A protein has these predicted regions:
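ATP-dependent adenylate-handling active sites, centered on carboxylate activation for C-N bond formation
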Residues: 1-133, 169-185
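Hydrophobic alpha-helical segments with strong N-terminal bias
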Residues: 2, 30, 141-149
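Structural motif
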Residues: 21-22, 144-157
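A short, charged helix-loop
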Residues: 131-143
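Short Ser/Thr-interspersed hydrophobic loop/turn segments at strand-loop and sheet-helix junctions
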Residues: 158-172
Length: 185
């Protein structure tokens, strides 16, 4: 894909998505679907396999940090706040301390949602538009109460990230090119 092709198609891609989407994979999927539609009308995609089979690196996080998680939560919270407010961005370990100063339910909203910290988001959003993601995720976490952290993460991803991003993006980019994208999961 040349830079010219990218920019020429970007507005069309946004049109076909029907709503603002900040996932750059939509662009690659559009061009891939365009090429595939020249030869076939239906394709099988592997979308959903990472969520089902634990293929994302983030799913290893709870297992990798069990020792740190033995530190009492009030101390971890204090370390997380210290890291957020006192350590400059880019400091090694800052993100780790910030993430582990929160419970899984507080920090994990679905794959790839860590663009802004809550404090950063509040700085750029209009009053009254503060992130209220936990209102969306709380019922999901309640359904998997008592399950291990990885299962909880997968469940949230399957009900938010997979449905409202990955599968939708593949379907819309395929249909934009008269291609049916089927998923086996």
């Amino acid at each position: 894909i040349s830079p010219e092709e990218y920019w020429d198609k970007l507005s069309d891609i946004q049109y076909y998505m029907d709503e603002p989407v900040a996932d750059p994979a939509a662009i690659a999927l559009y061009f891939l679907s365009e090429e595939a539609s020249k030869k076939v009308k239906v394709v099988v995609s592997g979308e959903g396999s990472d969520e089902l089979f634990g293929g994302y690196n983030i799913y290893c996080e709870p297992l990798e940090h069990t020792s740190f998680n033995k530190i009492p939560m009030p101390i971890r919270r204090a370390l997380g706040k210290f890291a957020e407010y006192c350590l400059p961005r880019g400091t090694k370990g800052r993100g780790f301390l910030m993430r582990h100063g929160k419970t899984l339910e507080e920090r994990y909203f679905a794959n790839a949602t860590n663009i802004f910290t809550e404090r950063e988001a509040n700085k750029i959003l209009k009053k009254g538009c503060e992130p209220q993601i936990q209102k969306v995720t709380k019922p999901l976490y309640e359904r998997v109460q008592g399950k291990d952290p990885v299962t909880k993460m997968q469940y949230v991803d399957m009900h938010l990230w997979l449905v409202h991003d990955i599968l939708m993006k593949g379907d819309k980019m395929g249909m934009a090119n008269s291609l049916e994208v089927r998923v086996p999961f």
